[in-house]
């Protein structure tokens, strides 16, 4: 969800010229649309691309972008033949119609339940809102060491600015893209579960899962790096088949 520039660690600019972008902290629908615009600009300026590789928020963002693009333009081909998704977090919506369907019609009492940030209150929300908010709060709790923000930072807002999760039970769009799903066996349970939910968005038979012994990370050991490389080569080869 990169929309702001970031000062990079010393020495990186000698390898990559920049600019260096950082993730958007707000996670709201407007920020999602800003991120989609950056993807569109990149596709237009530097594309076409055969595939995309994403980690954590990057993986979730590319899934969000493709889902909402597919929903808006179902007859258009997608810009990637394959995806490599490593430890994705929750995919978030930018589409106003989807967000309104999930959160926009809530009563003031239900809006207060969201703002309370309490599981006991969120569990009393109408079904669609409860599914989306539970998925979101599980990931927010699991990633606080990264975001350095409590639930209230994201939930105590006007409803149009509350992050809205794309859940496979609520977003029925599916992606016919060859996909490698990579996850660490010691990742937080909520993040591990999120990987399975994201996997549900894909209906291509060209799918492979690679699990490694790290947590919210990519493989680091030599054998696992080689195994992941083999899995990447396999999914790329599959994407080139009819």
UniProtKB/Swiss-Prot annotation:
What is the protein's species of origin? Penicillium expansum (Blue mold rot fungus)
Q: What is known about what this protein does?
A: Serine hydrolase; part of the gene cluster that mediates the biosynthesis of communesins, a prominent class of indole alkaloids with great potential as pharmaceuticals. Communesins are biosynthesized by the coupling of tryptamine and aurantioclavine, two building blocks derived from L-tryptophan. The L-tryptophan decarboxylase cnsB converts L-tryptophan to tryptamine, whereas the tryptophan dimethylallyltransferase cnsF converts L-tryptophan to 4-dimethylallyl tryptophan which is further transformed to aurantioclavine by the aurantioclavine synthase cnsA, probably aided by the catalase cnsD.
Q: What's its EC?
A: 3.1.-.-
GO BP field? antibiotic biosynthetic process; monocarboxylic acid biosynthetic process; secondary metabolic process
GO MF annotation terms: hydrolase activity
| Stated family | Belongs to the AB hydrolase 3 family.
Question: Which residues of this protein are catalytic?
Answer: 56 (charge relay system), 138 (charge relay system), 216 (charge relay system)
**SUPFAM superfamilies, alphabetized:** alpha/beta-Hydrolases (SSF53474)
Gene Ontology cellular component?
A: cytoplasm; nucleus
Q: Pathway it acts in? A: Alkaloid biosynthesis
Q: Keyword set for this entry?
A: Hydrolase
Q: Supply the Pfam families for this chain.
A: FSH1
Keyword Nuclease on this protein?
no
Under which name does UniProt file this protein?
Serine hydrolase cnsH
